[in-house]
């Protein structure tokens, strides 16, 4: 825990590529060998922090949709993307490890894999509210939508250091436009209270 807290503090001041195991050890007042005892390398340490971000993403997805405000399927997309933008802008670990530029390929792979899982969860949320048609397989369109939005967020983070309202809006427009290729403008609402 002390090691993780040290990395969070370092991430507030530096990019991921500028942090070494030595820096982490110095920040938490431990011997470098102690840090290596817990994590074999810096990428492994970052990966463990990213796992915490993924847990947060899962919780966020469960909490961000206000059923009283869901009148059209695009409301779900807006609520999900708005929640993720707020999370990214307040979490340096997520911003720097997911949106930032670094050479840790394993982290990018883990993020893509998690988006595939999230895509299925997002689809279940949509189906909870609307009778949407069968979707193409094997790629989940909601996972693609999440990845597309992340690309815009990444551009914003790299240029401005955070996700600007303007680029958050662009990500929303892009993800919504993509989803409209598969989800009709008018979908029958599902009465899940009586189901």
What feature does the model see in each segment?
Residues 2, 6, 10-44, 48:
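Helix-turn-helix
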Residues 3-11, 53, 57, 84, ...:
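Short hydrophobic clusters on alpha-helical segments that form packing/core surfaces
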Residues 11, 46-53, 98, 114, ...:
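Alpha-helical DNA-contacting segments of helix-turn-helix folds
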Residues 21, 51-61:
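Short, basic, alpha-helical segments at the C-terminal edge of helix-turn-helix-like DNA-binding modules
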Residues 62-89:
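Hydrophobic alpha-helical connector segments
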Residues 78, 82, 86-87, 106-131, ...:
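Amphipathic alpha-helical packing segments from all-alpha helical-bundle domains
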Residues 87-106, 151-157:
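Amphipathic alpha-helical segments used for helix-helix packing
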Residues 96, 128-175, 185-195:
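Hydrophobic/aromatic-rich alpha-helical bundle segments in the mid-to-C-terminal region
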């Amino acid at each position: 825990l002390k090691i993780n807290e040290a990395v969070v503090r370092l991430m507030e001041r530096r990019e991921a590529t500028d942090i070494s195991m030595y820096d982490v050890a110095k920040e938490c007042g431990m011997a470098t060998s102690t840090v290596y005892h817990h994590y074999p390398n810096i990428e492994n340490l970052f990966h463990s922090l990213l796992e915490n971000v993924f847990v947060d993403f899962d919780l966020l997805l469960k909490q961000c949709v206000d059923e009283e405000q869901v009148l059209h399927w695009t409301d779900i997309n807006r609520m999900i993307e708005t929640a993720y933008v707020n999370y990214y802008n307040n979490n340096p670990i997520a911003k720097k490890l997911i949106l930032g530029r670094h050479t840790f390929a394993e982290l990018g792979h883990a993020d893509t894999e998690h988006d595939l899982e999230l895509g299925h969860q997002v689809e279940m949320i949509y189906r909870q509210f609307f009778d949407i048609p069968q979707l193409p397989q094997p790629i989940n369109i909601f996972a693609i939508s999440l990845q597309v939005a992340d690309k815009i967020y990444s551009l914003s983070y790299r240029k401005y250091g955070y996700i600007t309202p303007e680029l958050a809006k662009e990500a929303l427009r892009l993800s919504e436009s993509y989803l409209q290729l598969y989800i009709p403008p008018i979908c029958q609402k599902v009465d899940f209270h009586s189901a």
